């Protein structure tokens, strides 16, 4: 019924959408497709530099296949990776003993969810030397071959893992390490040493970069291509696997590669921070800020759900009241949310003078207030609708079932200006201009 009603309400939009996507094939043209044939690239060096800068690596390979460019690649020396899958208590204790001898530990958690307040730990990888790593499995498929089923005493596994993070003099390295620390805290494990986040360091060095994913950082700084996660879990969609469903040998290598690459990135990024005289900002501002954000995210935000519901009901009635006022001006009912229907009402039926062609944007409605009171009611309608749909109804859906609080994520690497941003949900974009918003 919902889909049927949506189709009925948006019939005008559907016909317009069809018209917009229909290719017009009856045009008179004076050129042929051969006129647009791509024959050569004059400035090949700049093309290669540009696609590298914008991380468009697939374009280079396509151009090479078409023989438009030839990239001279030195043969890469592939180093042997010493990644160990921990399968029993003896291997676990030996690994922990080896790890604790180092004062620099890079680690990465494999989990079941991108939300740190609900994710379960699938396994943990740790590296203290380049091209080396240990993977400690926690969750894994039940249909494993008998030779590789872990025989670890899992009753005290987190007490064992806690030893690794109980070293105040140790530097702990990670990619988006805030996420991992939040999960470990939920499991009763505190990371007590100093911290280095490769993602934050890369953002500080280049705040306008398109992506700070470790795959891209690895290519740029290490000239090393990591295993794409899609190779393990498949593309996004209903058939995508969980990390806990991946064979141990595959997830072990993938996870160790993450902690290994983060360790190698640390050396280069820390050197670059010093070179650009950004190390003080990183260690005295960014990392302390991250620690505060960890506490804020973990604590969460308490909201009065009953108040949200009551206010949502009130705003719902306000929306109905404003809708009736709008219809009283037009003497006809229409879909207020349809830009096409609204523009027809404003400019054809009521005869208002268009400000920006037939736009019905907020700034246009502000101008139209001078011509007709319907514009004021339309602005009220949009304001109330946004309050109800985006905030009053949406924010309570983010309540954590165990804490009954909202645990938003504060991000240091999204805005190029350095300001914090908030996601899932966004708590920084709540309107406060009107009395009811406040």
Enumerate the language-model features and the residues they cover.
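Conserved nucleotide-binding/hydrolysis micro-motifs of P-loop NTPases
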Residues: 178-181, 200, 209, 341
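Amphipathic coiled-coil/heptad-repeat helices and related helical stalk/stem segments
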Residues: 88-92, 153-158, 177, 247
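Conserved beta-strand -> loop -> alpha-helix junction used to position metal-binding or nucleic-acid-contacting
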Residues: 190-207, 214
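Conserved "right-hand" nucleotidyltransferase catalytic core of DNA-directed polymerases
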Residues: 6, 10-147, 209, 217, ...
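Acidic beta-strand-to-loop metal/phosphate-binding motif
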Residues: 106, 169-177
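Catalytic cores of nucleotide-enabled group-transfer and carboxylate-activating enzymes in metabolic
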Residues: 106-108, 157-163, 196
